[in-house]
Each structure stands twice: as structure tokens, then as C-alpha cells.
Amino acid sequence: MKTLKLARRLISVLGVATLSLSAQAADLTFGYINGIDPIKRAIADGEYEKGIGQKIDWRAFDAGPAVLAAMASGDVQIGNLGSSPLAAAASRNMPLVAFIVSAQIRSSEALVVRDGSGIKTPEDLIGKTIAVPFVSTSHYSLLGALKHWNLDPRKVNIVNLTPAQITAAWSRGDIDGAFTWSPALGEIRKTGKILTDSAQVSNWGAPTFEVWVARKDFAEKNPKVVADFAKVSLAAIADYSAHKKDWTAASEPVKSIARLTGANAADIPELLDGSYFPSASEQKTAQYLAGGTASEIGKTAEFLKEQGKIEKVLPDYSGFVSDKFIGE
């Protein structure tokens, strides 16, 4: 119950936050989480500053809820987060718009159990301590896995830790397992085994994805900035898709991602392979920004409500998604 109360408190904070109107085009602050994707290479190499033509203050966050809090306060105008925190925020009518689906999460997020923990089957999770960043895509996937296994989440000691805290808690032996992403995932896999991952959970009916969102007031006043941001992002994805075999651990793109995120360069090619990155042409299709993304946000919200993480589900989430910034 304690973890459930913490999750509700976090969602409540996001829900009551209001967006100030202080953002100006000449003062850009963008936030990201340290998931592994081609866009991180563009951030590390300064391509957004070149493409947008302005100085950008980049801020790294531990997880999506922290990005949302910064956007709600007015500190950040454009941010990177997962489908679960987006669904929670949209259900509270936070004025945001998702304008890029940056990744369909597959094996890049996983539930790892510690060697020697005694966890060999899903049923062994009962009574064990499992860490996850609350209201994140990993949290959603963990709850989806427990539902698939017919396990009551209340019988598992689920604790709220950021990826960095997960790595530290793992090294101390404080937790038996964790559902997370890299760099933490790459570290804990060294002394643990994967029980399931987001690809498998997606097949069980709980898919997750990552997006870039803008504050609605900022997007309305600065559509070219948002469109230029999308252009740089999708060029980075296209470069990876066209030269995937060249993105080895010793390559410059992978070194750039490692420098930005702190992930081990040797792990990055496999982690990149653990997600699917929709192309510019795919973004505007019914599968993504032209309908599918809004539908998936709604399904995620329904699941979060079922799990007691949010209080209501909106009848329509299409107002939180737009494809108009693609190709402008």
C-alpha cells in the first residue's frame, strides 16, 4: 500500500501542476531521459543547435515523471518521456502535445532478477523486493507482466527507485530484481538474468513506447522550432536505419551516445537493436501520430486506472498528439 500511495502522490503532483506562459523561443530548455536511441547521438553532437539555430540548454532526467514536473513548472519546453507517464499526465489534462514517436520499446527495457535471489519463475517474485521507477514505461511493463502471470502486485514488494538508484541498490544487495532501462539495465544484467522484457510484455497486450512532447503554448507560438526539432530527430533515426551495421561499439555515433548517457559503448549496439524507431514516413500513418498513438495512450490510461494509478480516463486522447510538425 505504501508504494501505491507514493505513486498516487506523484501523479497528484503532476495533475495539479499548471503550465506557465513564460517560455520564449530565444530561451530553449529541452529535457531527456537516458534511454538508448539514435536521437541521443544528435543531442551529443550538437545537431539540434545547428538545425534550430539557437542555443539549447539540455537537461537529463532520471525518468519521465521528472521531465513532466519540469515542463509543468515552465522550466522545460520540449521533453522526452515514455507512454505511461504521458498517459498519466494527459489523463490529468496537462497541456502537452506528442509530436514524435521516438521508439517502440522492445527488449531495451527488462525485468532482471539477481543471481542467488531464488527467483526462477514468476511465482518466486512473491515476497521479493523489485525496484522500478514509478509511473514509467518500465513500471507499466512490470504491472502488465504481473497481470499476465496472475500475480497480485500487492504480494510483491515493489519499490520506487530511479535507474541510478537501482544500480546502487543492486550493488548493495538491497533488491532482488528490477525492471529498468540502460545504463542501469546493462549493469545489473552482469549479475542477474532476464525474467521478461518489454517486447514480451507487449505481446501480452501492454506495449510501451517513447515520445517527444512539447508544451502546447510553446508549440503554438514556436511551430518552426518544434518542426525543426522533429526534422533533426528523424534525420538521426534515418541515419541509424540506413547504417545500422556501422554503429558498432567503436563507431563515432555509439561513442557519442555513450558520452551523453553514461552507458557502456559495448552494450549500445544491442540496446539500439532492442527498440524500433519509426521513420518520418511512418510517423504520419494511422499506426502512429495519425491515430494509433492516441489510441495506445488511451489503452495505457485504462490500464493505469485499473491498477489504481490514475483516477479517470478521458474519452479521447487525440488532442495530445499531432503530426503537423512532421515534414514542415
Predicted regions and their residues:
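Hinge/cleft segment of the Venus flytrap/periplasmic-binding protein
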Residues: E302, E306-E328
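Cleavable N-terminal signal peptides
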Residues: S12-V13, A23
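Short, glycine-/small- and polar/acidic-enriched structural segments
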Residues: A26-D152, N157-N160, D176-F179, S198
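Sec/Tat signal peptide C-region and signal peptidase I cleavage site
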Residues: L19-A25
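Ligand-binding pocket segment of bilobal, Venus flytrap-like solute-binding proteins
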Residues: L68, V76-N80, I166-I194, R215
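Bacterial N-terminal signal peptides that target proteins for export
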Residues: M1-I11
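Secondary-structure end/capping motifs
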Residues: E220-K309
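Periplasmic-binding protein-like
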Residues: A103-V113, I194-A219, A230, Y317-G327
